[in-house]
From Swiss-Prot:
Its EC number is 2.7.2.7. Transmembrane segments: none annotated. It comes from Clostridium pasteurianum. It is found in: Cytoplasm. Its main location: cytoplasm. GO terms for cellular component: cytoplasm. The keyword Transferase applies. One of its GO terms (biological process) is butyrate metabolic process. Pathway: Lipid metabolism; butanoate metabolism. It is an enzyme of class 2 (transferase). The gene is buk. This is Butyrate kinase. Catalyzes the conversion of butyryl-CoA through butyryl phosphate to butyrate.
Length: 9
């Protein structure tokens, strides 16, 4: 889930 946040800086 938080991986999506890594994609969105």
């Amino acid at each position: 889930m938080y991986k999506l946040l890594i994609i969105n800086p």
